[in-house]
Structure formats: C-alpha cells, structure tokens
C-alpha cells in the first residue's frame, strides 16, 4: 500500500477513475452513490451517552439524530452558528449543521461547506431551488433533502448560512491509500462502512471511502477521519488530468480551480475534498443532473 501525501491528489484520483473511461454507468458507480438497502433500519437507542475524542460534550443516539439540532461536539472550532445552521426552522427547514456538521465539515455523503465562496454557495442553493442541480440517482436522500431545503429556506436564511460557512477555514480529514485489496463494506446511512470482519475484496475501478472510526462518524463528529482506498496508479493518472488535461481528454482542473485547486471568489476549492463526493459531482455534470451556472465548464 502507498499513502500519497499531497492534498491535490484527492481531486486527482476521482478524475483518474472517471474521465478516462468516458462511459461510466450508474451500476459502475455504486461505490460513489451508496444507497441504503430496502430493509435498512437505524440502530435502536439504548439511552447511553455517546462520547468522541477531545470533546466534553455528550449526546444520546436519539439526540444526534435530531434534524433540528446541530450536534456540536467542538464549539470552539467555529464562531456562533446562525439560528438556521444550529436549529433550522420547524417544520420544514432542518438545521444545516445537522447534515453538514456544526462547522460545515460534512462527510462522504454530502458536501464539505467549510470555506466555500459566498457567491458559489448562494448560486448552488438557487440551482437546487430551480431544478438545475439534481442528482443522477433520484432516490438518494442527501441531495433530495438539499432540494427540499432550498425551496423552504428564505433568501435571508440562505444569505446568513452562506456567510457563516464561507467564513470557516477549510481542513481535511482524509488520507489516501493506493491498494489492490480493500476491506469488505456495507452501505449504512448513505455511506460505505467497513464490516470489521477482516475480509477483503478486489478494489477494481472503485474508490472505497470509509470512516476510520464508524462510531465517531455515526455520532456526527466533525473531526471524524476517513480513509480513501484507491486503485494502484489512479493518483498519478488523475494528477495528469488535473494538471494538463491528459493530452486533450479533459480541461485541466487548474484552469478554473486555480494552480493549487483552492478555488477563487466564485469557484469552489476541490483540494482535499471527499473523492466520493467529487466523483458524484463529475458524473452529475456529465449526465446533465448538474446543469446550473458554470457546470458546463
């Protein structure tokens, strides 16, 4: 196994897997669009208080599932949350910080909002509202919640949410491992989870992104860390696409997102982001599910 150390590689490997094939189908991308099985059920709450590292807070499992209360394990990580981020607005605007975490860190199932440009954030909410931004898998809940939320949030709520998340400094919680074999996984809560059985399987042409500690992730800890297992050689292939476009197969990512992939005042950073999330966005642009402003670029 090899663990690359450069943050731009997170974007590179998603590009390396998606762009060269040119004909990825939804079945091929099940790893990027994890779907809960029909018989999926949440674990029951035994009433015990959950803890995460480096936090004095404690929550029951039921409390971490309250969509009208951001689970804030590390209040010192961020400035005071706007009301709509912390608690939403009942009955139909969930707390933004519940899905995306109090400091916007998100997870493989959704977007990391930390440091997104204000103008870009507002435009994405407009695109969700207008129907210009959807998902290639219509029944996928995280995007469905965003579409619903965009239609019930007021412009003022979107404005203060965008200002809050754009003020936060981005950080990464992901390490990349190139390997031919990966742990066996199941889908739980719209993400892949290591079964913990010790069994392995061939990675094929997939990215397998899992939480290092599933309990911390389930507790909605914004500091929960992740591993992205990627096929051998995918990082170098992706890096070529990111930097040069690989002899015309793609526009170099740096053309729009900047030489260090940290974005601009209107274009989002892609450095250090979840490769599963990036893969979904690339595929959604390709299929036309993302057709909003700048998507064609």
Label each PLM-derived region with a short phrase.
Residues 25-94, 136-252, 287-297:
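Flexible coil segments in periplasmic/lumen-exposed cytochrome c-class electron-transfer proteins
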């Amino acid at each position: 196994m090899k663990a690359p150390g450069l943050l731009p590689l997170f974007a590179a490997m998603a590009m390396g897997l998606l762009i060269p094939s040119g004909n990825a189908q939804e079945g091929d991308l099940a790893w990027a669009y994890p779907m809960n099985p029909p018989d999926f059920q949440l674990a029951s709450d035994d009433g015990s208080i959950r803890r995460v590292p480096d936090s004095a807070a404690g929550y029951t499992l039921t409390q971490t599932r309250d969509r009208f209360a951001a689970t804030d394990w590390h209040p010192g990580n961020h400035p005071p949350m706007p009301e709509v981020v912390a608690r939403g607005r009942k009955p139909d605007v969930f707390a933004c910080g519940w899905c995306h975490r109090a400091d916007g860190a998100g997870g493989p199932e959704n977007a990391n909002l930390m440091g997104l440009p204000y103008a870009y954030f507002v435009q994405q909410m407009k695109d969700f509202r207008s129907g210009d931004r959807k998902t290639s898998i219509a029944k996928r809940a995280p995007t469905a919640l965003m579409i619903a939320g965009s239609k019930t949030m007021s412009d003022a709520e979107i404005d203060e949410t965008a200002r809050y998340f754009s003020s936060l400094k981005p950080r990464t919680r992901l390490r990349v491992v190139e390997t031919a074999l990966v742990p066996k996984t199941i889908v739980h809560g719209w993400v892949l989870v290591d079964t913990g059985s010790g069994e392995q399987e061939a990675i094929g042409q997939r990215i397998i992104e899992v939480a290092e500690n599933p309990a911390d992730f389930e507790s909605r800890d914004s500091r929960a860390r992740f591993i992205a297992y990627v096929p051998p050689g995918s990082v170098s292939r992706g890096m070529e696409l990111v930097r040069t476009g690989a002899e015309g197969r793609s526009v170099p990512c740096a053309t729009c997102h900047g030489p260090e992939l940290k974005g601009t005042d209107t274009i989002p950073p892609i450095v250090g982001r979840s490769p599963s999330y990036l893969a979904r966005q690339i595929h959604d642009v390709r299929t036309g599910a993302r057709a909003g402003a700048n998507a064609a670029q």
